[in-house]
């Protein structure tokens, strides 16, 4: 299938430089100009500011402050389910992992080993397991929360490209989520291990976690791993674990032993909300 022009263009533009510039601009505190940009963005993308702890657009000093805004308590009630949806967004794909192959879009798969930065040992944990890929659009709430209780085991920063991660790009860029910059966070609980993979994209200025702070920038040229086995970092189901600046994607991985049953109403492109039931 021929690639659309908008996808072809992504191969040509300097995505990393463009993203670095966007990140700097998003940190600017430019008074009325910042407010004007935020007001346009909120209107253009129909952002529901009534859900925010601070609904006053004029009070945000920078675009990043606005974009990582907190929600009011109770804005996303937690369902009674084993696994909760970790973000607001839209379902890209979900289901079983076929040995080590994760379904991206029609005609495209990628391996768990590639997604996990070549860590074959970690990838074996998820052979024939389960995955869910959720796309966050610019209008969505951009903090990521825990789908279940978990003790942090490790975090790995993986350098990569910065293609857009919207559905159109996912259909036309092979191995998209395994080639973009990403942060792999692995956890464990009484049921076994699971992983949350935060995938970067064009204009996504940075990714951060609650235990580390901003992971990128700086954008390192090599894989870097932090181990937390000797630290008792535990997060409860529904608790914040990280955040994006601008839209991106989260991939959740579970082992075969999880024996998950995804919600009957789940299907690709369906809008989902943080805290709703994802699987039993």
Swiss-Prot record:
Record's catalysed reaction(s): a 1,2-diacyl-sn-glycero-3-phospho-L-serine + H(+) = a 1,2-diacyl-sn-glycero-3-phosphoethanolamine + CO2
Record note on modification: Is synthesized initially as an inactive proenzyme. Formation of the active enzyme involves a self-maturation process in which the active site pyruvoyl group is generated from an internal serine residue via an autocatalytic post-translational modification. Two non-identical subunits are generated from the proenzyme in this reaction, and the pyruvate is formed at the N-terminus of the alpha chain, which is derived from the carboxyl end of the proenzyme.
Keywords: Cell membrane, Decarboxylase, Lipid biosynthesis, Lipid metabolism, Lyase, Membrane, Phospholipid biosynthesis, Phospholipid metabolism, Pyruvate, Zymogen
Gene Ontology process terms (BP): phosphatidylethanolamine biosynthetic process
Keyword Secreted set for record: no
E.C. number: 4.1.1.65
Localization in the cell: Cell membrane
Entry's Gene Ontology cellular component terms: plasma membrane
Sites marked Cleavage (non-hydrolytic): 247-248
Active site residues according to the UniProt entry: 88 (charge relay system), 145 (charge relay system), 248 (charge relay system), 248 (schiff-base intermediate with substrate)
Reported function: Catalyzes the formation of phosphatidylethanolamine (PtdEtn) from phosphatidylserine (PtdSer).
HAMAP family recorded: PS_decarb_PSD_B_type1
Protein name: Phosphatidylserine decarboxylase proenzyme
Organism annotation: Methylobacillus flagellatus (strain ATCC 51484 / DSM 6875 / VKM B-1610 / KT)
Lineage of origin: Bacteria, Pseudomonadati, Pseudomonadota, Betaproteobacteria, Nitrosomonadales
Encoding gene (name): psd
């Amino acid at each position: 299938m021929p690639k659309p022009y908008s996808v072809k263009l992504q191969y040509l533009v300097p995505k990393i430089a463009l993203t670095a510039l966007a990140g700097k601009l998003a940190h600017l505190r430019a008074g009325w100009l910042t407010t004007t940009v935020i007001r346009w963005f909120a209107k253009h993308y129909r952002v529901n500011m009534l859900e925010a702890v601070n609904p006053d657009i004029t009070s945000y000093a920078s675009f990043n402050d606005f974009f990582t805004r907190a929600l009011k308590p109770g804005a996303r009630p937690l369902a009674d389910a084993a696994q909760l949806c970790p973000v607001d967004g839209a379902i890209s794909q979900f289901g079983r992992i076929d040995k080590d192959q994760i379904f991206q879009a029609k005609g495209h798969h990628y391996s768990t080993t590639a997604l996990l930065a070549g860590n074959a040992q970690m990838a074996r944990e998820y052979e024939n397991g389960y995955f869910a890929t959720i796309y966050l659009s610019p209008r969505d709430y951009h903090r990521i929360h825990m789908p279940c209780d978990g003790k942090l085991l490790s975090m790995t920063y993986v350098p990569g490209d910065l293609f857009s991660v919207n559905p159109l790009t996912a259909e036309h860029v092979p191995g998209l989520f395994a080639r973009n910059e990403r942060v792999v966070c692995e956890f464990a609980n009484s049921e076994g291990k699971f992983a949350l993979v935060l995938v970067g994209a064009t204009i996504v200025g940075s990714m951060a976690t609650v235990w580390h702070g901003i992971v990128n920038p700086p954008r390192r040229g090599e894989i870097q791993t932090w181990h937390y086995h000797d630290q008792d970092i535990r997060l409860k189901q529904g608790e914040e674990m990280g955040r994006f600046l601008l839209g991106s994607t989260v991939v959740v991985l579970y082992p075969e032993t999880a024996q998950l049953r995804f919600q009957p109403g789940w299907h690709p492109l369906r809008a989902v909300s943080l805290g709703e039931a994802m699987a039993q």
